[in-house]
Regions:
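Short amphipathic
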Residues: 7-14
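Non-heme Fe(II)/2-oxoglutarate
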Residues: 166-169, 209, 214-255
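Non-heme Fe(II) oxygenase catalytic core, chiefly the N-lobe of the double-stranded beta-helix
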Residues: 2-5, 18-202
C-alpha cells in the first residue's frame, strides 16, 4: 500500500498511545505559553504551526516516554538522521483564514486545494523560487487527541509520489545531489502538481490517538478545511509530526 498509494496507516498500538498521552500533556502547556502563541499562531488564529515545539529527543522520546511500536520498527529500515523535536500542529474551528503574506490566489489555493505541497521544497527569496532545502525521509503523523474526520485532517493525493519522483528524477539528471538545494525547481514542481490534481485521488488521512500514519516524502499533501459540525476537544485538533532528513540525500527522488 505504501509504495503504490504513498501513505500507510498503522492501527492502535499501546506504545504509541502512551507517547501520545505524554505529548498531549506537553502540547497543552506549549500552546498556553504567550510567546509560543505569538510565534506560531497563523491564519488569523486558526493554525498553530508549532515547528519543533515539543521537547522530544533524537529518538523521539518525550517526557520520559519512549517512541516505540510497530510503526517505529517499520521505519527503522529506512535511511534517516536522528529525529528533530516534534512539530505540534494544532488546527482550530474556522481554518483556513488568510495567512500573513497570502495573496488572493495563495489563499484560494489554501482553501480549495488544501495548501497542497511536497515537504522540503521551500520558497526561497523575494520571488519565492522553490528549492529542495530539506530532503526529508518521510512524514510520521501521531494524533494526540480524538477528533472527527471533519476537523481538518491531513489529505494526501494517492499515488502522487510516483509522479513527483518521475518529474524530479528527470529534473536532477546530471546534477550532483550535493547541489540539488541550489536548483530552481519552481516550474517542474508546479507542472507536477497540476498532473497530480488531474490524475490522483484526494483522500482524508484520519487517525485516533494510539494510531499513526506515514506519508511518503514525495507525496503531495495538505490540510483540509475545518468543516461545519466537526467534533474536536476545546484545545483544537492536535497532531505531532516528525520529518527527519535523509542521511543519504541522493535517495530523495527515489520511490
Amino acid at each position: 500500500m505504501f509504495i503504490t498509494k504513498g501513505w500507510r496507516r498503522f492501527s492502535y498500538d499501546p506504545a504509541i498511545a502512551a507517547w501520545a498521552q505524554a505529548a498531549l500533556r506537553q502540547a497543552k502547556a506549549v500552546v498556553a505559553q504567550p510567546e509560543m502563541r505569538k510565534k506560531w499562531l497563523q491564519c488569523q488564529g486558526t493554525w498553530f504551526v508549532g515547528v519543533d515545539a515539543l521537547a522530544s529527543d533524537g529518538q523521539g522520546a518525550l517526557g520520559g516516554v519512549f517512541l516505540a511500536g510497530e510503526v517505529i520498527d517499520w521505519l527503522s529500515e529506512m535511511d534517516f538522521l536522528p529525529f528533530h523535536p516534534a512539530q505540534l500542529s494544532v488546527i482550530y474551528p474556522g481554518y483556513p483564514k488568510p495567512r500573513i503574506g497570502d495573496t488572493e490566489a495563495g489563499f484560494r489555493y489554501r482553501k480549495n486545494r488544501d495548501a497542497a505541497h511536497v515537504d522540503g521544497l521551500l520558497a526561497v527569496g523575494p520571488e519565492r523560487r522553490r528549492m529542495l532545502k530539506e530532503p526529508h525521509a518521510f512524514i510520521l503523523g501521531l494524533p494526540l487527541n480524538s477528533c472527527s474526520p471533519a476537523a481538518s485532517p491531513m489529505v494526501v493525493w494517492e499515488g502522487s509520489h510516483l509522479i513527483i519522483a518521475e518529474v524530479f528524477q528527470k529534473a536532477f539528471v546530471g546534477i550532483d545531489a550535493a547541489s540539488w538545494a541550489e536548483v530552481d525547481v519552481t516550474a517542474v514542481y508546479q507542472a507536477a502538481r497540476r498532473q497530480v490534481f488531474e490524475r490522483c485521488k484526494r483522500v482524508l488521512v484520519h487517525a485516533a490517538p494510539g494510531e499513526a500514519y506515514v506519508v511518503h516524502r514525495l507525496a503531495l499533501h495538505g490540510v483540509a478545511p475545518w468543516q461545519s459540525g466537526a467534533d474536536a476537544p476545546e484545545e483544537g485538533r492536535m497532531i505531532a509530526y516528525f520529518r527527519p532528513e535523509l542521511e543519504t540525500k541522493s535517495l530523495w527522488s527515489a520511490v
